[in-house]
Amino acid sequence: MKVAKDLVVSLAYQVRTEDGVLVDESPVSAPLDYLHGHGSLISGLETALEGHEVGDKFDVAVGANDAYGQYDENLVQRVPKDVFMGVDELQVGMRFLAETDQGPVPVEITAVEDDHVVVDGNHMLAGQNLKFNVEVVAIREATEEELAHGHVHGAHDHHHDHDHDGCCGGHGHDHGHEHGGEGCCGGKGNGGCGCH
């Protein structure tokens, strides 16, 4: 079976920045499962996987435009500190979901001032070209429920209390390994491992 739309694919991968810094990985023992062709991965990686088979190992370079896009200065904002009422101590590096007209957007605090906080809504890998080392671990047919929901369901029973067709990580689902709240495989703004 070859990687194609509507199939569930299990990937082991490492991703590095152009200068070789490892930013994320998912080993063979805990692969990333995703529904191919549903925007669950960044477009450059999903395109590169098309047609591959179980056991295929390959490297792929994904440019910023096919990953998380270019860095957008308009996504950096200075907001009043009282927006964060209920948070005891605001620190640089803290991440939050900001409610916007387009829905929740992950932001990171980049500066804390006397009465204001500077937040950045860019993905942590925006503007970066990425290098992936990938292994296709498994491929299977998706269930009707997975196709209807637009994402993979884990080994345990998966119930939904939402009415959107979200995808792994991008809308609050977890695929079983840690990305520090961001992740690197997620599709731009609408899914994948990453929140953004």
UniProtKB/Swiss-Prot annotation:
It is found in: Cytoplasm. It comes from the Bacteria. PROSITE patterns: FKBP_PPIASE (PS50059). Ni(2+) binds at residues 167-168, 184-185, 193, 195. One of its GO terms (molecular function) is unfolded protein binding. GO terms for cellular component: cytosol. This is FKBP-type peptidyl-prolyl cis-trans isomerase SlyD. It comes from Escherichia coli (strain K12). The lineage of its organism: Bacteria, Pseudomonadati, Pseudomonadota, Gammaproteobacteria, Enterobacterales.
